[in-house]
Regions:
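Positively charged, small/polar-rich N-terminal and surface patches that mediate targeting and assembly
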Residues: 1-148
Length: 148
């Protein structure tokens, strides 16, 4: 996933960075989508270099910019999330977390308070997203499987 096909006749674009999100395997579909969306907003907000140029269609209608590179979506058990979280912090990668408590809140202030109330090793993680050098992200996510 470190390569993107270029338009006809162009060379593939290769990335030395990677964006990956790890979701807990026991989440309901709506929870997976919600967690992924929130985590990706964190990666985008904390890493403006991940954002590409604005889009436009053939009629000139403008659309918002999106990530400049693919996002790898993985899944794993509770232990895998804890392991990946620790690895990401040890490697000082840009990291976003989503805990089970956030399903009970309805705004950013309460979300931040819910995370702040629990120590790092006791967080009930349901999602972790990371951005960094490709090889470092691969090491962080080692053992996780591709999301179906």
């Amino acid at each position: 996933m470190s390569e993107q096909t270029a338009p006809a006749g162009g060379e593939p674009i290769r990335f030395d960075t990677k964006i990956a999100v790890l979701l807990r395997e026991d989440l309901q579909v709506w929870q997976r989508l919600n967690v992924c969306a929130f985590l990706m907003s964190g990666i985008a907000a904390g890493n403006p270099e991940t954002i590409g140029e604005p889009y436009a269609d053939a009629d000139g209608t403008a659309y918002l910019s999106m990530f400049r590179q693919p996002v790898v979506v993985l899944e794993g058990g509770k232990e895998m999330l804890a392991l990946a979280h620790g690895r990401a912090l040890d490697r000082e990668l840009s990291t976003a977390v989503y805990t089970a408590d956030l399903f009970m809140t309805g705004n950013d202030r309460d979300n931040r308070a819910a995370v702040r109330a629990v120590g790092r090793d006791a967080l009930d993680l349901v999602g972790v997203a990371v951005f960094g050098r490709k090889n470092a992200v691969d090491k962080v996510m080692k053992g996780a499987v591709m999301h179906p």
